[in-house]
């Protein structure tokens, strides 16, 4: 039976509240302390080796120099579902999306071992790639507890403009999940049209390296410092 909108919203609040108040060991560090710190990066471009990939590579190379491992998952070019608000991920306590025919749950499986996250996307009409938004929204609903409280950053790549709006759109889910946003010397933006052209954006590449160093520093700083205990989410609506 399909979950009503009110039931779905209440379930979301309950899951978020639980994640916010549960012990850190359950969600933020579901691995041994002596393992190497790791950042999970998601390439949201339909071009596997385009400018988004080039920006993420700059981040990965810098993280490696700082002693932090990384893994990049490409969302690919196959159709990706959007969230249909069925609520089964929550009502059945699945911890994953009920639909298992695209990359969403493959990413979910990687969340627990990640100490930080980086999302990268090209800019389409001032927004991130729709496929990335679709998959990440489902992941946040189904497995947001495994993202909760971990450092996160987003990268927007564009030919000319619209990247700041895309950048903000990608940041917003992390802001709802109590994730410290990793900043840089500028917004995490790179410019380029043809594949690889972003490498010529000297300031953009420097921005990626600075963000990566900040990410490594923050992950290491938080390793043995659990977040504060959070109050349960007091969810209200404009219409009762």
Question: Whereabouts are the PLM-identified features?
Answer:
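A short, Lys/Arg-enriched amphipathic alpha-helix followed by its capping loop at the start of a domain
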Residues: 58-68
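Helix-loop-strand module that forms the ligand-binding subsite of alpha/beta enzymes
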Residues: 37, 98-186
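A short beta-strand-loop structural module common to alpha/beta enzyme folds
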Residues: 69-78
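Cysteine-cluster motifs in flexible loop/terminal segments that predominantly coordinate metals
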Residues: 78-111
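Glycine-rich phosphate/pyrophosphate-binding loop and the adjoining helix
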Residues: 180-240
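N-terminal secretory signal peptides and thylakoid transit peptides that target proteins
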Residues: 1-15
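C-terminal segment of N-terminal export signals and the immediately downstream linker at the start
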Residues: 23-49
């Amino acid at each position: 039976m399909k979950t009503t909108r009110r039931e779905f919203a209440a379930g979301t609040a309950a899951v978020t509240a639980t994640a916010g108040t549960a012990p850190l060991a359950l969600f933020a560090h579901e691995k041994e302390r002596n393992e190497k710190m790791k950042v999970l990066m998601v390439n949201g471009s339909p071009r596997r080796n385009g400018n988004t990939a080039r920006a993420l590579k700059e981040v990965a190379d810098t993280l490696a120099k700082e002693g932090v491992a990384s893994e990049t998952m490409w969302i690919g070019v196959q159709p990706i579902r959007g969230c249909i608000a069925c609520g089964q991920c929550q009502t059945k306590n699945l911890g994953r999306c009920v639909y298992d025919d695209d990359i969403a749950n493959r990413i979910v499986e990687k969340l627990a071992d990640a100490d930080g996250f980086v999302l990268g996307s090209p800019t389409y009409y001032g927004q991130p790639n729709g496929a990335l938004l679709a998959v990440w929204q489902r992941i946040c609903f189904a497995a947001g507890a495994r993202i909760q409280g971990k450092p996160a950053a987003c990268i927007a790549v564009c030919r000319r403009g619209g990247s700041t709006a895309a950048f903000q759109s990608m940041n917003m889910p992390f802001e709802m999940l109590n994730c410290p946003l990793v900043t840089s010397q500028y917004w995490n933006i790179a410019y380029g049209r043809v594949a690889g052209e972003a490498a010529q954006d000297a300031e953009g590449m420097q921005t990626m390296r600075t963000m990566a160093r900040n990410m490594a520093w923050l992950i290491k700083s938080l390793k043995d410092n659990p977040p504060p205990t959070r109050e349960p989410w007091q969810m209200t609506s404009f219409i009762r």
